[in-house]
């Protein structure tokens, strides 16, 4: 199953997340199919998600994680 979820990048105590499309069987930071945005939880908070690609992947059956659903509403 294809899922849209966050993968962590950044460094220790300075998280930065990429919004990616990946196979649900892959590890959190394993390979991904496509990167469709990013999320910076530190001040100033910053969210960018490509809505066109998000809608495409949802259209072909990708499921979103709970966190990505909440973030996509804010973006």
From Swiss-Prot:
InterPro entries in the record: Ribosomal_bS16, Ribosomal_bS16_CS, Ribosomal_bS16_dom_sf
Q: Which GO terms describe its biological process?
A: translation
Question: Which Cys pairs are S-S linked?
Answer: none
- PROSITE patterns noted in UniProt: RIBOSOMAL_S16
Q: For this UniProt entry, what's an example GO CC term?
A: small ribosomal subunit
Keywords attached to this Swiss-Prot or TrEMBL record, sorted alphabetically, are: Ribonucleoprotein, Ribosomal protein
| Pfam families cross-referenced by the UniProt entry | Ribosomal_S16
Please tell me whether the keyword Ribosomal protein is annotated for this protein. Answer: yes
Example of a GO MF term:
structural constituent of ribosome
The keyword Calcium appears for this protein: no
The UniProt entry's sequence similarity note says: Belongs to the bacterial ribosomal protein bS16 family.
What is the name listed in the Swiss-Prot or TrEMBL entry for this protein?
Answer: Small ribosomal subunit protein bS16
Query: Which species expresses this protein natively?
Result: Helicobacter pylori (strain G27)
Quick one: which gene encodes this?
Answer: rpsP
């Amino acid at each position: 199953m294809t899922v849209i979820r966050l993968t962590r990048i950044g460094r220790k105590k300075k998280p930065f997340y990429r919004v990616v499309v990946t196979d649900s069987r892959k590890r959190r930071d394993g390979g991904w199919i496509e990167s469709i945005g990013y999320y910076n939880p530190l001040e100033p908070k910053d969210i960018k998600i490509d809505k066109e690609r998000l809608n495409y992947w949802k259209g072909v059956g990708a499921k979103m994680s709970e966190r990505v659903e909440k973030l996509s509403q804010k973006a």
